[in-house]
Amino acid sequence: MSALLVLSTAPSKEVATLLAKTLVEQHLAACVSIQEGITSFFEWQGEMAQESEVLLLIKTKESLFEALKTTLCALHPYEVPEIIALEISKGHLPYLHWIDSVTKDPV
């Protein structure tokens, strides 16, 4: 099992909570941590932008990434949501096994 940490941002805690609950309820993520108080700076449509955002730290397995990404894109209010996956190369083995045990591959 190859575990991933997926990073995504949302415009509010309410949106982040909806995304997190959906991913966990659908067994696409073992855990989603929400961090408020993020400030993002980026260029959008030729203009410099600064926005307050909420960061989602999504723990899942690699085999679920495409389904997770599809679900995030379908529910996300952003035109181009941030969805970045980082492979977890090392970790506490019982935690990594837990990720595998509570997530379910699509049928």
Name each model feature, range by range.
Residues M1-V107:
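Positively charged, small/polar-rich N-terminal and surface patches that mediate targeting and assembly
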